[in-house]
Design a protein with these regions (language model features):
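Non-transmembrane, aqueous-exposed alpha-helical and coiled segments at domain scale
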Residues: 1-170
Length: 170
């Protein structure tokens, strides 16, 4: 909802289509879209942890490379290992794994659709789909993002929480 509001404000339009490959040409004229054929991309990276940081950095850098006609064999397959990642996968699947980067500056906003992700491995209890993706010969690297939320810090003591169920399980 926030993105729609930002785009309406910037583009002065009231009808923003849902993001997908088929609606790229229908986006407001000020929105930057991929200039490359996404169907020609092949995976080179599996990335675990598709948070905002990843989408605004690694994914965007690869997108910019692809915009220059390079790196089309370095597309991203997203992955997650937590139950909440299932909802994110479904949201991204519904928009053909496209994401939107809104860059704010003192002089305004730039809105760009990022197309470097081409798939998101299904989340399974045994991580079988993730392991299968990582084992593919075309995958050159596996990357991951770890944020402060991944460190299991006790909010009271500000110390590592070794009693957290996830840590005990590991």
């Amino acid at each position: 909802r926030e993105l729609d509001d930002l785009m309406r404000e910037k583009m002065q339009t009231s009808a923003i289509p849902k993001l997908s490959n088929s609606t790229l040409s229908k986006l407001p004229s000020g929105v930057k879209i991929p200039n490359y054929n996404r169907s020609n991309l092949t995976a080179g990276i599996v990335h675990i942890g598709l948070g905002n940081f990843h989408r605004a950095h690694q994914s965007w850098y690869l997108h910019r490379l692809m915009q220059q006609g390079k790196g089309h064999d370095w597309a991203i397959i997203g992955a997650g290992v937590k139950e909440f990642d299932k909802a994110q996968r479904l949201k991204l699947l519904a928009q053909d794994f496209l994401t939107t980067l809104v860059e704010l500056s003192p002089v305004g906003r730039e809105v760009e659709v990022v197309g470097s992700m081409i798939d998101y491995a299904p989340i399974e209890a045994n991580n079988g789909a993730l392991i299968a993706q990582m084992a593919k010969p075309e995958i050159k690297i596996v990357t991951l993002t770890v944020t402060e939320g991944g460190y299991y810090v006790d909010p009271v003591s500000k110390s590592f929480d070794s009693s957290h169920p996830d840590i005990v399980y590991d």
